């Protein structure tokens, strides 16, 4: 499972001009689900997202988590994060889980983050979306449940 985590002052997702998810201060997280992901990857990602310390404390040091600051999370499924461009010029998405298999994993990730006490909004699975991301910093972190960057 792969995630691009962006610290934001606000985030919003629109589908066909209608807002389907919106948050204030927190994270916009783009999530790619890999063919070989398991329940362990979901648990790992949920824990990392909720406890990632990238919000500033009173001394200006990145030391606080989403839970510490009462932040929200906008989770957006994005299979293109699994794209492989090492060969040729067109990305290959063979490492992405098929949509009908990925949806339950995405929903389980949403559920696990909510269980940890974070307000979660989402985009619309498999829809063309317009994603508004008002970066704060900017702070952007890459997380992969299987790889180090």
Curated annotation (Swiss-Prot):
Disulfide bonds: none annotated. Its EC number is 3.1.1.96. It is found in: Cytoplasm. It comes from the Bacteria. GO terms for biological process: D-amino acid catabolic process. Its main location: cytoplasm. GO terms for cellular component: cytoplasm. Transmembrane segments: none annotated. Gene3D superfamilies: D-tyrosyl-tRNA(Tyr) deacylase (3.50.80.10). It catalyses: glycyl-tRNA(Ala) + H2O = tRNA(Ala) + glycine + H(+); a D-aminoacyl-tRNA + H2O = a tRNA + a D-alpha-amino acid + H(+). Keywords: Cytoplasm, Hydrolase, RNA-binding, tRNA-binding. One of its GO terms (molecular function) is Ser(Gly)-tRNA(Ala) hydrolase activity. InterPro entries: Daa-tRNA_deacyls_DTD, DTD-like_sf. A motif (Gly-cisPro motif, important for rejection of L-amino acids) lies at residues 137-138. An aminoacyl-tRNA editing enzyme that deacylates mischarged D-aminoacyl-tRNAs. Also deacylates mischarged glycyl-tRNA(Ala), protecting cells against glycine mischarging by AlaRS. Acts via tRNA-based rather than protein-based catalysis; rejects L-amino acids rather than detecting D-amino acids in the active site. By recycling D-aminoacyl-tRNA to D-amino acids and free tRNA molecules, this enzyme counteracts the toxicity associated with the formation of D-aminoacyl-tRNA entities in vivo and helps enforce protein L-homochirality. A Gly-cisPro motif from one monomer fits into the active site of the other monomer to allow specific chiral rejection of L-amino acids. Belongs to the DTD family. NCBIfam families: D-aminoacyl-tRNA deacylase. Homodimer. This is D-aminoacyl-tRNA deacylase. The gene is dtd.
């Amino acid at each position: 499972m792969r995630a691009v985590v962006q610290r934001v002052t606000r985030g919003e997702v629109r589908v066909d001009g209608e807002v389907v998810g919106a948050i204030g201060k927190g994270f916009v997280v783009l999530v790619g689900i890999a063919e070989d992901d398991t329940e362990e990857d979901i648990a790992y990602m949920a824990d990392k997202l909720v406890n990632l310390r990238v919000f500033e404390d009173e001394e200006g040091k990145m030391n606080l988590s989403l839970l510490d600051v009462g932040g929200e999370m906008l989770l957006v499924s994005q299979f293109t994060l699994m794209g492989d461009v090492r060969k040729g010029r067109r990305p290959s998405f063979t490492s992405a889980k098929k949509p009908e298999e990925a949806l339950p994993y995405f929903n389980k990730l949403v559920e696990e983050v909510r269980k940890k006490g974070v307000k979660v909004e989402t985009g619309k699975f498999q829809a063309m979306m317009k994603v508004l991301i008002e970066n704060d910093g900017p702070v952007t972190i890459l997380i992969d449940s299987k790889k180090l960057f």
